[in-house]
Structures are given as structure tokens and as C-alpha cells.
A protein has these predicted regions:
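Short, conserved phosphate/pyrophosphate- and ester-handling motifs at nucleotide-, phospho-/glycolipid
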Residues: 48
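Basic polyanion-binding and macromolecular-assembly surfaces
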Residues: 1-45, 56-358
Length: 358
């Protein structure tokens, strides 16, 4: 399936970490998971939204540009509750994260609906194969018992009244109890940790990457914003249906996007569960089927029964970039320490060669 898209698949190593946090009761704490019925396993994933946010953060960092300002609307109800409203983004492609990430603004008294679909289609980061990933559980403790003079203990009785030091001491002696400066956190409140080989996929729509529609039937921009962008150097295509980003800005964003695609990292939810999540291999092509076959897993029944084996394959129509760390997981491969640098340079050349005006 060849289209005017650039397809990127990445293979990453994940070790004892947390991706997305999940809201809910204590039995749904700390990690988003899904069930793989064919292999009867629950596996963790990093949501497409988190991957997208991480890539756009890397792009903004490479550009040394702050992300577009967002207004978070709140409504104070009659009973004193603060209710969430729709966040307002500026809907302005002048910001790289808006141009690449898209926007949506619902109809209001001041404006009509405007919506831009992102030219980046981004998958969740999920296991290369359910048998090549897993979850580990652990409990935790919040411990200050090494310095009891510095840390106090407050005890209240059944009525909620704070007990005096004498009352606490009497209770401890009469009941043969201790009062440690320690809080035990069971594993069902800590949540599982993910490990294994993970993949992500990105499709870059080259037809829409640097163009914004001027169509007012399904508007991406209002007329005032179209006029403002033209004054800032954006040009109309020959048919007048799209605005095209200025060449100088295109070149800067291409460099930053290539960096984001090759060097993005999950930066949230890892204060106690940091994993470098190194990229082991990247596959790049204009054909989605080729990148998914270049980095894949094969089933084998040799030895201990059904197992999955990671495969890195090279063939016509796909460029594969393999780092030395990949040799710890895949046999029979050729790796280079500068492979990701080469991938970044090739992505830059690919994006520069595309035609963005029609």
C-alpha cells in the first residue's frame, strides 16, 4: 500500500517502568493494559496520545520553541463546584506543535467550528509480540524510621481527637505494640511495571504536512486567520485551496521532526520507574507493509514450546537502522553506533524531497 506518506516503525527496549497512569479504583492503578486473547496475557502499552505528546515535545525542544498557549476553561456552578470546559487552543499553524499535532475548537458565540486533523498518524507503543513483554508487581514503603527524632507520629482516637504523648505511650506498653515511621503500600496500590520489546508506528502524511486548507465548508482556519498567515509569508497554492508554510520554517520543522521521530522519549510517570527505553532499531519506507515486516516477531515451537522470536529483516523498499544494543535481543544482524544519526539524516532528506505545494 504505497501512498504519499512516510512510514516509520521503531523497536524499543523497556525495563521495569510505567507508561500511562490509569484512573479508577485501586485495582486499576498505575498502568494501562490490554488483554491479548490469543496468548492469554495482559500487557502494558503507552497510549498513542502519550507517544504523540512525547514526539511533539521533542520537536518543540529541538526548535527551542514553547508549545502553543492553551486556555483551560472552568465554570463555577451555583453549588460551588468547578466544572471543566473545552480547552481552547489558538488553532494557529504558526506554532509547530499545532501544525503537526492538529487542533479542534467547538462552535461558540464568537466563532464557528474549526478543526485540523494532524498530518501525523501515531500508534500506541505496544509489545512487538505479547510473548516478548510482561508485567511485574511490587509493593513499596514510605520509610523514615532511620531518623525518628526528625519525624513525628500523630495518633488520633476513634473520636478523631489527637492523643497525647502519654496516652500513646500507655497504649503501646499495654498492647505490646510499636509505632514505626513507616507506611506500607501494597502492590495493588503501586501498580505493575512493564518490561519487554515494544514497537511504535508513525505515518507522516506528506500531502498535508505543511499545508492548511482554506476551505470554509469544513474550515481549518477562519478567514481572519487566513489573511493573517498570508501577511506572515504563507502562500496560497495555485488552486487557492491551501496555504503553504514558508520554506524557511519548513526547513526548521523538518530538522526538528526528524529529531522527534528518532529521539523522542516518554518523560512522564517515571520518577521512580525510569527506563531509558533505548531505540534498538528503526525502519523507514513509503510502504506501510514493508516497515511492519522489517521489524516483526516470528513464532517458533522449538525447545520449550511456543515462543516468539524478534526479527530484524532487510529487503528492497525499506531502510533499516540498527543500534548495537539490539544485538542483545536479535541474532544475525549488523549494527552501527551511529545508526540513529543516519536515520535522522535520511528522514530529513526524504522530507525535503517531498512536494508541499500544488
Amino acid at each position: 500500500m504505497s501512498t504519499n506518506c512516510l512510514f516509520v516503525r521503531g523497536l524499543r527496549q523497556v525495563e521495569h517502568t510505567v507508561f500511562c497512569v490509569q484512573n479508577g479504583d485501586q485495582n486499576q492503578n498505575g498502568q494501562k493494559t490490554y488483554y491479548a486473547p490469543r496468548f492469554n496475557r495482559k500487557v502494558a502499552y503507552s497510549s498513542g496520545q502519550q507517544v504523540k505528546r512525547s514526539i511533539l515535545d521533542a520537536v518543540s525542544e529541538a526548535l527551542n520553541e514553547r508549545r502553543a498557549p492553551v486556555t483551560f476553561n472552568k465554570t463555577l456552578s451555583a453549588d460551588g463546584d468547578l466544572e471543566d470546559g473545552e480547552p481552547w487552543s489558538p488553532c494557529n499553524p504558526r506554532y509547530a506543535d499545532q501544525l503537526l499535532g492538529g487542533w479542534m475548537r467547538a462552535k461558540s458565540e464568537e466563532s464557528d467550528v474549526v478543526k485540523r486533523r494532524s498530518p501525523l498518524s501515531i500508534s500506541a507503543m505496544r509489545p512487538l509480540h505479547p510473548l516478548l513483554a510482561g508485567l511485574a508487581s511490587e509493593s513499596a514503603s514510605y520509610d523514615r524510621s532511620d531518623d525518628p527524632e526528625q519525624h513525628s507520629v500523630r495518633v488520633v482516637n476513634a473520636d478523631g481527637d489527637e492523643m497525647s504523648d502519654e496516652e500513646v505511650q500507655e497504649f503501646l506498653e499495654s498492647n505490646d505494640r510499636t509505632l514505626p515511621r513507616r507506611k506500607w503500600i501494597p502492590e495493588d496500590q503501586v501498580g505493575p511495571r512493564a518490561h519487554g520489546l515494544y514497537v511504535f508506528d508513525v505515518a507522516v502524511d506528506l500531502d498535508r504536512l505543511f499545508t492548511v486548507s482554506t476551505n470554509q465548508h469544513e474550515p481549518e482556519l477562519d478567514p481572519e486567520k487566513i489573511e493573517e498567515l498570508q501577511e506572515q509569508g504563507w502562500t496560497l497554492t495555485e488552486n487557492g485551496e491551501h496555504l503553504v508554510c514558508p520554506d524557511e520554517k519548513q526547513d526548521k520543522i523538518i530538522e526538528a521532526l526528524a529529531t522527534g521521530l528518532t529521539d523522542w522519549r516518554v518523560t512522564s510517570n517515571q520518577s521512580r520507574t525510569f527506563s531509558p527505553q533505548p531505540t534498538l532499531c528503526l525502519a523507514v519506507s513509503d510502504n506501510a507493509n514493508r516497515v511492519t515486516n522489517a521489524i516483526r516477531a516470528d513464532l517458533t515451537e522449538e525447545g520449550r514450546g511456543e515462543e516468539a522470536v524478534p526479527i530484524i529483516d532487510s529487503f528492497d523498499g525499506v531502510s533499516v537502522y540498527t543500534m548495537p544494543a539490539c544485538k542483545g535481543h536479535v541474532t544475525g544482524i549488523t549494527a552501527r553506533p551511529d545508526a540513529l544519526d543516519e536515520a535522522r539524516e535520511d528522514i530529513v532528506e526524504w522530507l525535503r524531497a517531498a512536494e508541499y505545494a500544488a
